[in-house]
Structures are given as structure tokens and as C-alpha cells.
Amino acid sequence: MYQAIVFLPLLGCILAGLISLAGARARFPGGEPSEFDHGHGGHESHAAAHDAHGHDAHAHDDHGAHEPAAAGSRFAELATTTLLFISMLLSWLAFVKVGLGQEEFRAPILQFITVGDLKVDWGLRVDTLTAVMLVVVTSISAFVHLYSIGYMEDDPYRPRFFAYLSLFTFSMLMLVTADSLVQLFFGWEGVGLMSYLLIGFWYHKPEANAAAIKAFLVNRVGDFGFSLGIFAVFYLTGAVDFDTIFAQAPALSGKTFHFLSWDLDALTVVCLLLFMGAMGKSAQFLLHTWLPDAMEGPTPVSALIHAATMVTAGVFMVARLSPLFELAPTAQSVVIFIGATTALFAATVGLVQNDIKRIVAYSTCSQLGYMFVAMGVGAYSVGMFHLFTHAFFKALLFLGCGAVIIAMHHEQDIRRMGGLKSRIPFTYWMMFIGTLALTGFPFTAGYFSKDAIIEAAFVGHNPMAIYGFVCTVIAAGLTSFYSWRLMFKTFHGEPHDHHHHEAAHEPHITMLVPLGALATGAILAGMPFKELFTGHGVAEFFRGSLTFAAGNKVLEEMHHVPVWVALTPTVMMALGLLVAWQFYIRRPDIPVALARQYKPLYTFLLNKWYFDELYDFLFVKPAMWIGRTLWKRGDGWLIDGFGPDGVSARVLDVTRNVVRLQTGYLYHYAFAMLIGVAAFITWFMFASGGH
């Protein structure tokens, strides 16, 4: 059963991939033409048509060139989706057997690597932590697959799209079932690669290409630190499998690395390097810049990346390595600081964004910050609880955005929407439920998990915990404001584009069913599981999959916080709702006036704190200058000038000068002969005189 959960998506990928290859060969028997021969021109004309209507081509979720689909496209869709639903059902069964039935599963698959002292076996490790992730990954992926059948119905390359989705899911499943750091790293890099392919799926769009490359490169920065962390763990323990590492972890306390003139605590260094990987993969502060640009990919990709796969990998990794982080309080302080700063930063940026998908993207960034605050204060199960609930309502919001985009003919700017509640009522109510859960409305899924994080931060004993508490409380109010801003500007008020508004309609049934299912999860994923993740049943539920230090009483103390602490998140949620209603329903002139009055602040937030511009100045432009200099000076002038090109140029110079001697005049040749004879006689005389 457990092997089937992991490998069924891989089987679906292979089937869809073969259909995609066959379709490509049938469409282009002589090989795929250049971008100017197919697709690109059609896509440019499609974008130009949007521009002709006065719209920003950047703010559209286009579906690529209009070409006939490959034969077997429907089979590829149905096969991958069916296999994912089977995997989902098996995952829920595994959750019951492992999480509730106290069963654990270990299965070796193959001997992976044997080099010197390094031995890595590829095996499946299914404990409660894994079971939770299996449910999240397969459930969200299954509904994203079903949703994509309707969303991508006009795309001729959908077999390739479904192959990518399934391989993305398999990579994440390989990551969460990993029994060693090396296997986890392969899954880690797999989701990174697949995010690159899916974000850049419409590769004829320059914006999609740029976003894919940006995501790939920013994650390489984090992955470099993650790699160093794995090397350091192997150096300290001589192993990469989790059981050996965790058994030796207590003995590593007090060990140091001597670096330059410093003696650094070994566990702190290791945990910080590993967390650097989590910062990149989970789009935390400083390595967050790729996440909003990832919206250039198809909307189902956004839902899968943000709800169940790539961005949750960092949170899962910290939870899996809780035996190490519990012994490194300084590293935990850094985790809290980065998480809390991310939660607040992303919430402030989300206040003024106008792209419907980017608003939800920044909410993801912010909510991931909440999860890391929980991890930093030692409330690992609470962080996993928020990961679990967040997956349902965040996937719901993204897929709801996709339905809005389809209804508005691929428009994504909320300033051009309005009044859609009457045109797409089902989508409205589904997004309404998702917004309630995101803002933490009482008794929704988000209410139980997000409030628990704030309470855990309040009682945390880490010196940075109070900073986490303050930031998450403020972010709760901001989250409520920008979430309801999105709802009010999209679905309420007067329509701003009457042409698109009149033509708006509900999407295909395959897109509506996932919305309904995820809305159910957004409501019910909280209360039934609250005791397992945050109550007295945590130790029995997670058993050895999470480690809590002897002095870690956060889960117990968080149930005894003052009443004002427990009520603060709800008050902030209500305050954000009231302000948004005042600004965008009752007095829509207020935000316009405030934007004019505080233009520097508004521009600062609109430009995302200028991180893109800062990184462009500090890293991108210098790197481009270095590359251009090495190309022009190093390669062109030095290597080619004194190497192959230089030798050939000198040969040409010599032959050019020799050719000049061939004048064609007889007296020139006679003169040359006389000079030669004279030179010979002179040499002979001197040579003879020497003897």
C-alpha cells in the first residue's frame, strides 16, 4: 500500500509523458521548430489582442498557443487523475493506520549509494509525520489534477502538463517518505526542478521564462546551505540516515567547529545551514523573491506549489529534524526571527497588490512565516497543524482565483473586476469560505491552527518568542484586511469591466467539484484534528516522529494563556474585516486618498520593499557585468586572441606578406635570384674562412 502511494504518481507521469512525446513527434516530425515557427507567434498575437484592449499583458493567465491537442490527451488527463485519487485514498488509509492505529512502516527499496564510508539506501519511512504529509500532498494534488482537466482544456500541451504535475507529486512524496538526508535531498531537488518546469510551462512567454529561472536560482542559494548542512551532519556523525543521526544528536551538544578565529557551536551551525535550505524552498524573508513571480505559471501550479508541495518542504524538514533543532536554541531564535519577519513583511506587501494571484501568494508567504514561528518556539506539532489546515484553504483560494480568471477571460487585476457575486455565486461562496479560514474566523480550520501558533509564541521560552508573538498578531489583522479587500473588490461593488462582467459564468464542473471538496476541508480540517495536533494527545499521536526536549512545555503552557491573548487573534481578524468593509464597500474613496497622501509608503509596499531592485543592484547587475567582461575580455580578447583565433590570424598575416612577393615581373625575380646568389657566396666565403 505504501509503495503504491509513492509510485502511482510516477506511473501516471510515465503514461502522460509517453503521450506527450508521441504527440510532439506527430506534430513536428522533423523535430520541434524554433519559437518563431510555432506557438510563439500565436501567443504573441494573443497577448497583443489583450493589449489592444488596454490591458496589461503581464496580468493574464494565458493558455498558450491554439493548436490541436495531441492524440490521447484525454487519456493522459484521466489516467494521471485516477492514479492520484487512488493514491489519495490510500494516504488517508495510511493516516488512520499509522497516526491513529500506532503502526509504523519501513521498507527498503534499493541500495542507492555506496562510496567509502557513505552508504545510502533508498527506503520508505512512514511514521505519523509522514502520514500527515502524505494526506496533504496527495489530497491537494488529486483535486488540482481534477481541476486542471477543465482549466487546461484548451492547451494543446496538456499531456506534458499532467506529466509534470504527477512527477512534481512523486518528488514531494519521495521527500516526505525519505529515510535519510540524501534521499530527502533528491526529493528536495526534484520539487525544485519540477517547479522550474511548471512555472515556465508556457515557455513562449518571456515573463514565465524569467520567473522560472528566478525561482530556480534563488532556490539554489538556499540549497547550497542545505548541502553544506548535510555535509556537516555526515562529518559529525559519519551517517546520513535519520535513526543514526538522531541517536547521536545528544552527544553533539558542546562540540564546536573551528572556523578562522572562531569556535562555533556545531549543532547551531548545522541547523542554520539546514534552515537556509528551508528559507529558499519555503520562500522566507530574504529568499522570498521568487514566490510572487511564480504566479506566471498556470493557476493549478500555483495551488500545488503553495498548498501542498514545494513551499511546505522547508517546514516539514525542520519538523523532521526536530531532534537537532531542539538542541540548538540559537538556531531556533533565528527560525523565529525569520518566520515572524516573513509573516509581517508579506502581510504588509499584500495590502496593496492588485494581481489576484499575487495577493494570495503573499498570504502563503506570510502563513509559512507563522509555521516557522511555531517550529522555532518548539511547538512542532502546532506548526504541522497549520501546514495541514492551510493546505486546504490555500488550495481553495488559488483554485477559486483560477475560476475568477477564467470567468473574466484571463484578467487578473482586481481593479478591473467587481460585482462578480451575481455572475459566479458558487465560486464566490467557496472563496468566501476560504477567506474565513485564512483570516481565522471562529471554528474554521485556520482559526484553530493559527490561533494556536500565536498562543505558543506567547508562552515560548526562547528570547525571540515575544517578537514572534507581536509580529504574528499584527500580521493577523493585516491578513484579514487584504483578504477581505480581495473579496470586496472582486465580488462586490460595481463592475469595472462591463464587457467581461456580462460574459462571466461559472467554470466547468471539473473545476467546481474540487472547490467544494476543498471548502469542506477548509471548515472541517480544524476541530476534529485539534486534539491530535495541539492537545494532550500529541505525544501519543506523533510518538517518535517529533522530538520535544525535556524542558519544552510549550504545548502544555499554551492552554493556560490569559484570556486577552486567546481573544487577540479574533479581535484582529474582526478589526481587519471592519476596516476593509469601511474602505471598499462604504467609502471606497478613502484608500485612494490614503494612497495619495502617503505615496512614498504606498509605493514602498507596492514595490515589495524594493527587494527585487536591491538584489538586481547587488547581485544581478554585477554578475551580468562579470559575465560580460569574462566573455568579451577573457574569452574573446585573451583566449581567442592569443589562442585559436590568434594563431589563425598570424598565419593569415604571414601568407598575406608572402603573397606580396609574387608580383609577376621578371626583373623582380631576377633581382631576387641575384640577392640569393650573393647571400650564398657571402655565407660560403665566411664559412670557408673559418676553417
Predicted regions and their residues:
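Hydrophobic alpha-helical membrane-embedded segments
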Residues: 13-16, 88-92, 394, 400, ...
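Aromatic-capped, Gly/Pro-kinked transmembrane alpha-helices
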Residues: 63, 68, 97, 101-104, ...
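Hydrophobic transmembrane alpha-helices and their helix-loop junctions in integral membrane proteins
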Residues: 140-187, 193-510, 521, 527
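Alpha-helical transmembrane segments
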Residues: 14-21, 143-145, 347-349, 486, ...
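Hydrophobic alpha-helical transmembrane segments of polytopic
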Residues: 2-12, 76-90, 130-137, 161, ...
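Transmembrane helix-loop-helix hairpins at membrane boundaries of multipass inner-membrane proteins
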Residues: 1-3, 19-142, 146-163, 236-262, ...
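Membrane-entry segments of alpha-helical transmembrane domains in multi-pass membrane proteins
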Residues: 1-11, 71-82, 118-136, 174-187, ...
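Hydrophobic alpha-helical membrane-insertion segments
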Residues: 82-99, 222-235, 431-439, 514-535, ...
